[in-house]
Design a protein with these regions (language model features):
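A short coil-to-beta-strand element that immediately follows conserved catalytic motifs
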Residues: 71-81, 148
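Short, solvent-exposed loop/turn elements at beta->coil junctions and helix N-caps
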Residues: 9, 79-86
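Active-site-adjacent beta-strand/loop module that shapes the phosphate/pyrophosphate-binding cleft
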Residues: 84-106, 128-142
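Conserved Nudix-box catalytic region and its N-terminal flanking loop in Nudix hydrolases
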Residues: 28-68, 160-167
Length: 167
């Protein structure tokens, strides 16, 4: 099928693809504390991630973002997909990845400082708003579990609502 038959008509709702990566090591998870100068999530802990660039698949984007933001490489697997309703014309397609068996030395980047955090300490950290919902779901997953599917929306007061589909 040629590209012209893919149905990407103007005026349709579109998704911007992004990856969000959580690398685990024993009972620790790698998070990045946002740099103080960041417009979004300054000084808050988040997963590693960013945009999928043209020509990349999701796992390649995850590997690139992980290396750029932390200096590490890891074995990645898809754990979930969340559509985020960010506006009337464009949303975000968020591919949630889990990394295991990390290799390399941690480095800071312009995005922030990566830190290994004990899973038991997560509740006491200043986390990005959706992490208290996403992390428990991701961390309980076992190899071979099907990826989860979710949708994030915002109400008239700007409050985030996340719902997950049943398998």
């Amino acid at each position: 099928m040629p590209a012209s038959d893919q149905g990407t008509l103007t005026g349709r709702y579109t998704l911007v693809p992004r990856v969000l990566i959580f690398v685990t090591r024993a009972q620790n998870v790698l998070l990045i504390r946002g740099a103080p100068h960041k417009r979004l999530w300054a000084n808050l802990y988040n997963g590693i991630g960013g945009h999928v660039e043209r020509g990349e698949d999701v796992l390649s984007a995850g590997r690139r973002e992980l290396l750029e933001e932390t200096g590490l490489s890891a074995e990645l697997r898809l754990c979930g997909v969340i559509t985020i309703d960010a506006g009337p014309e464009a949303g975000i397609g968020l591919y949630v990845l889990r990394g295991e068996r990390p290799q390399g030395e941690l480095i800071a980047s312009s995005e922030g400082t990566p830190e290994w955090v004990a899973q038991a300490s997560l509740a006491g950290l200043p986390l990005v708003e959706d992490l208290p919902i996403l992390l428990p779901r991701l961390l309980q997953m076992q190899p071979g579990d099907p990826p989860f599917s979710g949708h994030t929306s915002y109400d008239a007061h700007g409050r985030m609502h996340i719902r997950f589909s049943s398998p």
